[in-house]
Amino acid sequence: MVYSYTEKKRIRKDFGKRPQVLDVPYLLSIQLDSFQKFIEQDPEGQYGLEAAFRSVFPIQSYSGNSELQYVSYRLGEPVFDVQECQIRGVTYSAPLRVKLRLVIYEREAPEGTVKDIKEQEVYMGEIPLMTDNGTFVINGTERVIVSQLHRSPGVFFDSDKGKTHSSGKVLYNARIIPYRGSWLDFEFDLKDNLFVRIDRRRKLPATIILRALNYTTEQILDLFFEKVVFEIRDNKLQMELIPERLRGETASFDIEANGKVYVEKGRRITARHIRQLEKDDIKHIEVPVEYIAGKVVSKDYVDESTGELICAANMELSLDLLAKLSQSGHKRIETLFTNDLDHGPYISETVRVDPTNDRLSALVEIYRMMRPGEPPTREAAESLFENLFFSEDRYDLSAVGRMKFNRSLLRDEIEGSGILSKDDIIDVMKKLIDIRNGKGEVDDIDHLGNRRIRSVGEMAENQFRVGLVRVERAVKERLSLGDLDTLMPQDMINAKPISAAVKEFFGSSQLSQFMDQNNPLSEITHKRRISALGPGGLTRERAGFEVRDVHPTHYGRVCPIETPEGPNIGLINSLSVYAQTNEYGFLETPYRRVVDGVVTDEIHYLSAIEEGNYVIAQANSNLDDEGHFVEDLVTCRSKGESSLFSRDQVDYMDVSTQQVVSVGASLIPFLEHDDANRALMGANMQRQAVPTLRADKPLVGTGMERAVAVDSGVTAVAKRGGTVQYVDASRIVIKVNEDEMYPGEAGIDIYNLTKYTRSNQNTCINQMPCVSLGEPVERGDVLADGPSTDLGELALGQNMRVAFMPWNGYNFEDSILVSERVVQEDRFTTIHIQELACVSRDTKLGPEEITADIPNVGEAALSKLDESGIVYIGAEVTGGDILVGKVTPKGETQLTPEEKLLRAIFGEKASDVKDSSLRVPNGVSGTVIDVQVFTRDGVEKDKRALEIEEMQLKQAKKDLSEELQILEAGLFSRIRAVLVSGGVEAEKLDKLPRDRWLELGLTDEEKQNQLEQLAEQYDELKHEFEKKLEAKRRKITQGDDLAPGVLKIVKVYLAVKRRIQPGDKMAGRHGNKGVISKINPIEDMPYDENGTPVDIVLNPLGVPSRMNIGQILETHLGMAAKGIGDKINAMLKQQQEVAKLREFIQRAYDLGADVRQKVDLSTFSDDEVLRLAENLRKGMPIATPVFDGAKEAEIKELLKLGDLPTSGQITLFDGRTGEQFERPVTVGYMYMLKLNHLVDDKMHARSTGSYSLVTQQPLGGKAQFGGQRFGEMEVWALEAYGAAYTLQEMLTVKSDDVNGRTKMYKNIVDGNHQMEPGMPESFNVLLKEIRSLGINIELEDE
């Protein structure tokens, strides 16, 4: 296997057995591809902005003598880059400019004669752009648009499963759901009549819609029924016989023909009878006259002599009618064929309850139902019905909807019109009737073939279209009103509605969410999340059990494990590792094709619908070297069921064992040994891990760590291969390889790293280089680690030495006992950065001012501020300290004579302003690491703002000139090469100053051309530098675009280091979470025979009942990994020769039964082996992929190689007494995470604070600085103890007795510790409530 330079530094031993046929795809492609589709120009006009424009334009005036046509659009360049947008708190977006053409036609001239054409580019608002990592920066914060899983447009057949009515009768229904437009439902009622609803309104008989489509009763019956023909011959009644129709009936008369009796009266007609009738080719049989009574005629019968209607279509025949028909010469009578078994008379019955009889009455009925209370006119009724389903403006099935519609009705073509046709409606009714007749099945709406993914691009396009439609109305008005000769396209378009619609979607849609930025995994998972909630989706309250449950079609598409606990369970899911969406938005998953029993490496992506037709083998089926299945019977999935199939029947095979799960779950080693509930918690808690100060790769991983770290975008990844030319903490410079350069460029790539910035969750984002000078790199290599990554691998926590044993009750109920060593080594120390902002506004009484001159504040409080009133960088501040001094003008108040006197003597200033400074919130402390000042255009900048500006300018200039130097050096080395090869002597050349080199001329014409080209490039480079510097300078010095009424914003960033402490929440990766109960001195911790103490003691009782055995296997394997690291460490310390080291490491990598990983250390240089060994000293990292992990025997082998007991248990001694514990204890290395539930953020105390307005009781919660609720049960407890005075105190002066509590405060001040309880305010509230019910209630003072 070929390793890149970064991977060679530390190779993870892989226990996976199954070959990797398909690499893990780019994990953010669902976001990036979707948005790309939205903004890139699509010549077909199927997707994105292009589709939205084409669907709305051309806009015609009402008179039709002018129209506004769309030509093309382009997106401009964003004003600020992503970082600048985040700092300034603005949206990262690009201006949309659209070329429109106004065409004016001649009025009097014939149709289509053009009078005038004006073309112009019009600004249509800003479109937020996606960053490279799949996020949007909206108002300075990173947000993610979550994909939505919604019901696909199309037609669905369903039933109520017998729940609607007490009789338990199953009522079937059909629903046509368009992408946009009105829903059309058909449903049966108890009496088997068919009804229709439009947009879930009042139901009408279904035949109304057919009449509105201009069908007569005869035509309606013709569409839905087969006919039975009776003929009257020689006063006898003959019936045309179709034998198949008789099956299962009981003969009500002898069936005979040609003198032979086929079925006797009262006998059941069987298949044998039918065969005989068919064999003898019987076409007619004689039936008794009574047989026709009760049959329904299929058309109108008129007496031709008089023109009188004898019987109308859909009338029941009686013997009288039969006689009349016979007399008037109708010898052939057509009736409807119905029976109770599979040809129900539903439509015929429905026609009877239908009150309408022609098209107009049907349209009026529909109009009345849609617009109750409005008087219907013919035109209004017609246009309403036309617009409902047959107008492209109002109704669109979309390509997906049409495809699903046609598939559902078993039609061959999958393309068609976006609106409904007559045939569509009739075919849906026919299929519904077939289902009611017992032919066909209802659909399963939870099947992933019936639910599709709506991603960012599509949702943004819909919002954009909404904005355009609003503009369309305005444009139509303008075209009709204005003087067209002077109008230009830009006078008609108002960009406000468009940008408002887009802004609203990105800013406040339920699916536009504040990005979860705890760590790289939480970012990736958030972008791959799939929600069934949101506009057009489900709501939590209404979603039942079925929607939330795991469906067989989720396999390989949606993760069955990763979903939140709580009310959203099952509604918010995560995309599986290999899943992607197809052109229609349905999820598909890859499979290996199986041809003639041989598994090939050909990969097909199948959607849930396609998958149903195949037999698919599991990824862990055993194959021989040729790719044949070893066993005769293979476990496969087919049609949603798992069972055994013979190997010849298999069509496809899974690509990978981790195909089923999401990225989060695929990072849990030994997932296959964990109970599903705990695996769910494990997958969810990894997302809450806080990045530690020093990331530490997991000793036991799954091999997915690298993919997540690289794809998440938190690391710096090489765009092209080359060598490291320069590296420091904030930038890396790569000299690009010759073969990867574009012609005529300097061949230098510069990577600027992010330093100590704040994430959305207040954790710290910081990148650190992990390459050194002169090192070669390849494209895709990790150059710098971000938060929670270690040498390009995801590293969410720390490897801790754990023991499973009780320890003095300190690990009761999942508590965790931690050694002091963990605190000393800063293993779980995290940095948190908080942003505090102070806004200075323009008030009615005058502007607020940022200043150090604050009334009534002592010197000490101002000691950390500079003369502008802003805190110094580096100041250590605690709760209540002033960060930014600010005063607000105070209204003129009535002054007492004394105050007037004081003001007269001491001047004005002190009392007409009040202190409104920004202070550090209670319970927060830290160091000021950055201050930013934003000043409105036209407001004078203060000293601090100018200092910051100067510093930024200096920094920008320094960065750019360094960049220029690096690029220049690259260019000049190429110029030198050309000159030397052109015959200039190297020594003489080096004596010349570099600027003069370009003046030299070469005789070789080709070389001279090259030189001139390089000279041009040099000029261009300098010009570019000037331009960049000027742009930077303009950006830094220009005023900021602040919200209306805001003059200045000062942002202060506080950083705080948080060590681990009792009350912090920790967890493993298997759902084993707990709270730290005690930090124990190192000397008291249990230790082993070598005197090594354990770091963490966990409760063994947390394992059996929770059934997450994965943590035990992880602990054993971690022990083995560490053991091998210890042996390598010992060899390095003894300075053994490289050959021995190489041999031992090779042995470790080769261990395990037929593993897929082949590491050949003989191809590594000695330096590379030494570097590898150096990185393996702390333990050899191991990958045990999900469902394909290390087996027990392999763990034991590895333990043996590390000279450790194969039981995984060792003897421990008590740190306090030195006595041996009575039995061996499981000790090993587990990867522990510190979760973002820190005691510092939760602990809180109140003495006095704010009170609720109505009840006057203290508020609750830390945010409101609230108190602890003394609830109902606590009151019972005090009652039970008989502690009456304590209880009285709790319910009065400590809660809502307003007078009592002020009195008590005064008493305490006076040193008199008495209390006088009064009436609680909430009792008064109760009195008022009762009075409001009309019951007078008064307290009598006795």
UniProtKB/Swiss-Prot annotation:
GO terms for biological process: DNA-templated transcription. Keywords: DNA-directed RNA polymerase, Nucleotidyltransferase, Transcription, Transferase. Pfam families: RNA_pol_Rpb2_1, RNA_pol_Rpb2_2, RNA_pol_Rpb2_3, RNA_pol_Rpb2_45, RNA_pol_Rpb2_6, RNA_pol_Rpb2_7. It is an enzyme of class 2 (transferase). GO terms for molecular function: DNA binding; DNA-directed RNA polymerase activity; ribonucleoside binding. One of its GO terms (cellular component) is DNA-directed RNA polymerase complex. Its EC number is 2.7.7.6. DNA-dependent RNA polymerase catalyzes the transcription of DNA into RNA using the four ribonucleoside triphosphates as substrates. Belongs to the RNA polymerase beta chain family. This is DNA-directed RNA polymerase subunit beta. It comes from Salmonella choleraesuis (strain SC-B67). The gene is rpoB.
